[in-house]
Curated annotation (Swiss-Prot):
Keywords annotated in UniProt: Cytoplasm, Isopeptide bond, Metal-binding, Neurogenesis, Nucleus, Repeat, Transcription, Transcription regulation, Ubl conjugation, Zinc, Zinc-finger
Chain positions of all zinc fingers (C2H2-type): 195-218
Name the UniProt record assigns to this protein: Zinc finger protein neuro-d4
An example Gene Ontology molecular-function term: zinc ion binding
An individual GO BP term: regulation of G1/S transition of mitotic cell cycle
Species this chain originates from: Homo sapiens (Human)
Subunit (UniProt): Component of neuron-specific chromatin remodeling complex (nBAF complex) composed of at least, ARID1A/BAF250A or ARID1B/BAF250B, SMARCD1/BAF60A, SMARCD3/BAF60C, SMARCA2/BRM/BAF190B, SMARCA4/BRG1/BAF190A, SMARCB1/BAF47, SMARCC1/BAF155, SMARCE1/BAF57, SMARCC2/BAF170, DPF1/BAF45B, DPF3/BAF45C, ACTL6B/BAF53B and actin.
Record lineage: Eukaryota, Metazoa, Chordata, Craniata, Vertebrata
Chain sites annotated for binding Zn(2+) 1: C274, C277, H301, C304
Gene transcribed to yield this protein: DPF1
Gene3D superfamilies for this protein: Classic Zinc Finger, Zinc/RING finger domain, C3HC4 (zinc finger)
Length: 387
């Protein structure tokens, strides 16, 4: 049986030109990435490669330093263009360059006759500005080269890859998106790091990071300054109790074991200062009556505790407990504190499984207990949220 041999595949001229253009674009992008990334990871071989620095120019030639050397080349010359070296040997001097600056140089500081380049490099004070301008020129050329390639290299990545002088400040972003990125930096940081330290203002991406910061930074400083008595870390009382009971996770165990001072009759002696602002009244700037915990004696201003008007009046009618001593008002235990639900009108705590009927998940918005619903009626936070 005869076998049919297919003829060679004929490609159109347009297809061939497009393939050549794609090949040229890929090679140009590959060379640009190899010169910018240190090292460059070759996707075809999986080998990390570095720039070889073997390509030199005539202007990079310097005088020989060792016996028998005619030329020497500087290291990594592609990062910064060197000025023309003045060769002392007349046989090696280019005929097109006639520089008459040797005599003034010798008169000024008694520079050596041999390698003039080393003497010029010693005068760093007069050449720093020129070198900075040369570096900026190289950076501009490389960035302009990248704009011609159809790829998505970020301008910020380019700035990180191009080396800078050790004591030089970070340059401004170049390109069309540079201004927009600087303007959106604050909003991106607020969105990526929503957890803020209320003492120093440092931001974190998650709550465990903020908890670690509180425990190992501010708590350690406080324990080093005041070994006799320990103050509680500040916490924010929020109307959203679902977020509020999650804050119990970052309270240190050492702070839970705070021993209260008791009077001879057995009653707890409350602190005479606010544990959060230490008496400064930073929230309002006005004097306020302190609210003290019935179990540990810690005190705080209503504004520092972020209490509402109804909550401030309600906590004085019963034995109020701070966040570290809080227990369920129905069963009287502080176990399973992650299940505690706090009333937004009186700050009493209730286990969700102790309520009638029990709750599987905390409700959205404000929540009022049965006592506040009976006493405040339409003025309760739960009714205000619904309306």
């Amino acid at each position: 049986m005869a076998t049919v041999i297919p003829g060679p595949l004929s490609l159109g001229e347009d297809f061939y030109r497009e393939a050549i253009e794609h090949c040229r674009s890929y090679n140009a992008r590959l060379c640009a990435e190899r010169s910018l990334r240190l090292p460059f990871l070759d996707s075809q071989t999986g080998v990390a490669q570095n720039n070889c620095y073997i390509w030199m120019e005539k202007t990079h030639r310097g005088p020989g330093l060792a016996p028998g050397q005619i030329y020497t080349y500087p290291a990594r010359c592609w990062r910064k263009k060197r000025r023309l070296n003045i060769l002392e040997d007349p046989r090696l001097r280019p005929c097109e360059y006639k520089i008459d600056c040797e005599a003034p140089l010798k008169k000024e500081g008694g520079l050596p006759e041999g390698p003039v380049l080393e003497a010029l490099l010693c005068a760093e004070t007069g050449e720093k500005k020129i070198e900075l301008k040369e570096e900026e020129t190289i950076m501009d050329c490389q960035k302009q080269q990248l704009l011609e390639f159809p790829h998505d290299l970020e301008v910020e990545d380019l700035e990180d890859d191009i080396p800078r002088r050790k004591n030089r400040a970070k340059g401004k972003a170049y390109g069309i998106g540079g201004l927009r990125k600087r303007q959106d930096t604050a909003s991106l940081e607020d969105r990526d790091k929503p957890y803020v330290c209320d003492i120093c203002g440092k931001r974190y991406k998650n709550r465990p990071g903020l908890s670690y910061h509180y425990t190992h930074t501010h708590l350690a400083e406080e324990e080093g300054e005041e070994n006799a008595e320990r103050h509680a870390l500040p916490f924010h009382r929020k109307n959203n109790h679902k977020q509020f009971y999650k804050e119990l996770a970052w309270v240190p165990e050492a702070q839970r074991k705070h021993t209260a001072k008791k009077a001879p009759d057995g009653t707890v002696i409350p602190n005479g200062y606010c544990d959060f602002c230490l008496g400064g009244s930073k929230k309002t700037g006005c004097p306020e009556d302190l609210i003290s915990c019935a179990d540990c004696g810690r005190s705080g201003h209503p504004s520092c505790l972020q209490f509402t008007v109804n909550m401030t009046a309600a906590v004085r009618t019963y034995r109020w407990q701070c966040i570290e001593c809080k227990s369920c008002s129905l069963c009287g235990t502080s176990e399973n504190d992650d299940q505690l639900l706090f009333c937004d009108d009186c700050d009493r705590g209730y286990h969700m499984y102790c309520l009638s009927p029990p709750m599987a998940e905390p409700p959205e918005g404000s929540w009022s207990c049965h006592l506040c619903l009976r006493h405040l009626k339409e003025k309760a936070s739960a009714y205000i949220t619904l309306t």
